[in-house]
A protein has these predicted regions:
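Glycine/serine-rich anion-binding loops at beta->alpha junctions
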Residues: 83-103
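Active-site loop/lid in soluble adenylation, ligation, and acyl-transfer enzymes
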Residues: 2-85, 89, 196
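Catalytic beta-strand/loop module used to bind and position nucleotide/cofactor moieties
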Residues: 76, 96-196
């Protein structure tokens, strides 16, 4: 966390917002990607206030970042054979493996002023601080690891990504609470360092 924006200052900024909550609903992967784009645009346009959305996956999916190459990141044949759809999100970051009942994601759609004074890297830690605190409250010894991971002593448990548009931020974090780690090397082409 940056000294320019202490945690209590961020908590104050977040508490001042009139949050809109999107009910927790399972949808197919492509629908979730479309919802992120539409909701961010509606917040930007002033048609809705700052919004938090918790979402469940109705199908297994591999979600790649906006600048990634499907061919370089994903074994397409293995994904097809194992029943995973492949979709692209509007934010950056790496490929996420998402499974119904094993993965939950949340999105925050907020004005960028919430993280003003923070570097791009620091904004990840700031917007995920409540999740790290929630893990701790549940007895999970979670910590933040730059640039966009939440980890426990057993490894990565969540990854975040952001998109910024016209003074607003979409920040979403995917929590893999019961993922089958044996699927990662079968589906995602990553180095061993990313699997730890």
């Amino acid at each position: 966390m940056s000294e320019a924006l202490p945690a209590d200052n961020l908590v104050d900024r977040l508490a001042e917002l009139d949050w809109k909550l999107i009910p927790y609903t399972p949808y197919p992967a492509h629908m979730h990607m479309a919802l992120d784009e539409v909701l961010l645009e509606r917040v930007i346009a002033g048609a809705r206030g700052p919004t938090v959305r918790f979402w469940e996956w109705s199908e297994p999916a591999l979600v790649i970042g906006s600048h990634q190459s499907v061919r370089n990141e994903v074994d397409v044949a293995a994904a097809r054979d194992l029943g995973f759809v492949i979709t692209r999100r509007m934010s950056g970051g790496g490929t996420m493996l998402c499974e119904p009942g094993r993965t939950i994601t949340y999105s925050l759609y907020v004005p960028a002023t919430i993280v003003s004074g923070l570097s791009f890297r620091q904004s990840y830690a700031a917007l995920d601080a409540w999740a790290v605190g929630s893990f701790a409250a549940l007895g999970v010894p979670a910590t933040y690891r730059e640039i966009n991971d939440i980890i426990s002593p057993r490894g990565k448990i969540a990854g975040a990504a952001q998109a910024r548009r016209r003074g607003f931020v979409l920040h979403h974090t995917t929590i893999a609470h019961a993922m089958d780690p044996s699927l990662l090397p079968k589906l995602i082409r990553v180095g061993r360092d990313r699997l730890s």
